Amino acid sequence: MISASDMLAGLTGLGVTTVAGVPCSYLTPLINRVISDRATRYLTVTQEGEAAAVAAGSWLGGGLGCAITQNSGLGNMTNPLTSLLHPARIPAVVISTWRGRPGEKDEPQHHLMGRVTGDLFGLCDMEWSLLPDTPDALRGEFDVCREALARRELPYGFLLPQGVIADEPLDEEAPRSRAGRLVRHARTGPSDAAPTRVAALERLLAELPPAAAVVSTTGKTSRELYTLDDRDQHFYMVGAMGSAATVGLGVALHTPRPVVVVDGDGSALMRLGSLATVAAHAPGNLVHLILDNGVHDSTGGQRTLSSAVDLPAVAAACGYRAVHACGSLDDLTTALAGALATDGPTLIHLPIRPGSLAALGRPKVQPHEVARRFREFATEPWPASAVGSGTRAAAGSAGDR
C-alpha cells in the first residue's frame, strides 16, 4: 500500500499545480491529502468534464493540471479530452478509479465501465498505467508518465484500483455561501435593437487592456473573434462546448493577468454547474461575458432555453461577486470597466441578435499553435498593477481555496 503523501509527491514532481475532480471513495485519501497541502490547489467541480477543462486551463496558464474521477465519470470527460486537450495537445494527468474491475465484486452499475475503462483510455489516444501499491514501483510509473507527457504533449492516464492508497485524514472548511451583487442596466430599446455579436466583440476588443487574456467559446464566437483580430492572447475553443468558463477558471488561477471568457447562452446552459464552480473558487481576475442570442447559431439557429432562464440571477445566486445584466454596448463598456477595476469573478450578460458575419471563415492557425502562443503570453512577466488596483488573481495562492 502507498500513502497519499507518496501520490502527492509524485504529482508535484511532475509539476502538477492544480487537482480538480469529483470524488470517489477510492480517491478519498488523495483528495484529503491535496486539500491539506498548502502548496497544491484542489478544486471541487460539479461534473467530471469540468475537471478536464480546468486541467486544460491550468496548463494554458503556465501550470500542469490533474483531473481525477471515478471511472463512471470518464464519459463526462470524453468530450473535453478528445475535442479540446487532444487537438490542442495539452498535457495533463488523469487519474481514474477502477470500479467494476473484472473479477472483483462491485455494484451492477459499474460492471460494464469496469470492463472497458482501459480501452476507453486507449480510444482517447492516452497512454496509461496501473497505479502500483509500493512506493518504489510508484516512482517508476511517475517516471514513465513524465517521459510520456514530454514526448506526446497529451494527457496521460493512471488507473487506480481499490485499496492502493492508505487512509488520510481530512482538513477542510466548507465554502461559504454568498450571493453576488446584481446590477440590471436599463434596457434602451426593443429586442430587435440588440447589438450583433460582431459589434459586441468589437467593443470588447476596443475596451480590453493589452495584458488581458481571452478564452472564447466554441463555434461562431471564436470564428468571429479570429476574423476581427487574431491575437496571441486569444484562446479559441474549437471543441468542448460548455467548457469555456472552467478553462478560463484554470487560466485565471495561474496568472495575475485579467482573464475574460467570452461565452454563449447555449454553452453556458450546457454546463450550468460551471457557474457554481467558478464562483466557489473565486478568481478575482476573471470576467465571464455571456453573449445571449437565444439560439445555437453555429448549427442553424435552433433555439436554446435561455429565454426561460434568468442567467444573471443564476450567476448571482451561485456567488459571482458582481453580475451585470446589460442592455446595450454602452452598458457593456461600463460593466467591463468596473469588472477590470474590482475583484471578481464578475459575470456580464448581454443580449445580442442571432446571426453572424457572411462567409465567415475559420482559424487558419492550428489548435496546438493557438495553445502554445497563448501559454507563452499568459506566462510572460506582467505587473498586476497594470490594471485597476482591485483586480487580483489566485495565482500562487493555493491556500485560498
Curated annotation (Swiss-Prot):
A GO MF term: thiamine pyrophosphate binding
Pathway in which this enzyme or protein is active: Secondary metabolite biosynthesis; bialaphos biosynthesis
Entry keywords, A to Z: Antibiotic biosynthesis, Decarboxylase, Lyase, Magnesium, Thiamine pyrophosphate
Catalyzed reactions per annotation: 3-phosphonopyruvate + H(+) = phosphonoacetaldehyde + CO2
Cofactor requirement: thiamine diphosphate; Mg(2+)
NCBIfam families: Ppyr-DeCO2ase
Protein name in UniProt: Phosphonopyruvate decarboxylase
Annotated organism of origin: Streptomyces hygroscopicus
Lineage, highest ranks first: Bacteria, Bacillati, Actinomycetota, Actinomycetes, Kitasatosporales
Gene symbol of the encoding locus: bcpC
